[in-house]
Amino acid sequence: MSEFHQDLSEEKSKSQVKRELHALQELGERLAGLRPEQLDRLPLTDALRRALLDAPKHTAHIARKRHIQYIGKLMRDQDIDAILALFEQLDASSRQYNERFHALERWRDRLLDGGDEALEAFVGDYPDTDRQHLRGLIRQARHETAQNKPPAASRKIFKYIRDLDESRRGLR
């Protein structure tokens, strides 16, 4: 009789199976949102790759739902750990991008609020800075703020700082 109970404990309940299949569908929907070059980094079967690339074609609600269910079915044979690892990597790179973006925004605000000390600190971090150009942009941004004009120069400062940062990191 203990063998019978042991067999029952190893079987998954219908609810558990449904939860797992639903999780695969959600993961498949997230995969469908990736760009093709990101999908190329994953070890996917050809059928799943085609289904993921076809997903944007299904725009009607029921058709999309049915297609996502099909993707979930195809995902049963996939290496889920590799897919989850890619999403962790993408999320980490997105976090890094956001952190860098916020750091550049702080530099812009510091340059606008601070004086020459802020400019000197920035030039210390970014030695390739064109001081004269940056001073002109700062002066223009302060003038726009005083005149209650749209912050066009402030945007130019951010773009200039971002370009300097990208060139320093070798992204340009």
Curated annotation (Swiss-Prot):
GO cellular component annotations, sorted alphabetically? cytosol
Keywords tagged on the record: Cytoplasm, Ribosome biogenesis, RNA-binding, rRNA-binding
Work out whether the entry's keyword set contains Chloroplast.
no
- Please give one Gene Ontology molecular function term for this protein: rRNA binding
Asked if the keyword RNA-binding belongs to this entry, the reply reads: yes
- Main subcellular location: cytoplasm
Q: Which domain of life is it from?
A: Bacteria
Gene Ontology annotations of biological process type:
assembly of large subunit precursor of preribosome
Q: Where in the cell is it found?
A: Cytoplasm
Q: Name one Pfam family in it.
A: DarP
Q: Which HAMAP family match?
A: DarP (MF_00765)
The family assignment reads: Belongs to the DarP family.
- Say what the protein does: Member of a network of 50S ribosomal subunit biogenesis factors which assembles along the 30S-50S interface, preventing incorrect 23S rRNA structures from forming. Promotes peptidyl transferase center (PTC) maturation.
State what protein this is by name: Dual-action ribosomal maturation protein DarP
Q: Specify the species.
A: Azotobacter vinelandii (strain DJ / ATCC BAA-1303)
Gene encoding it?
Answer: darP
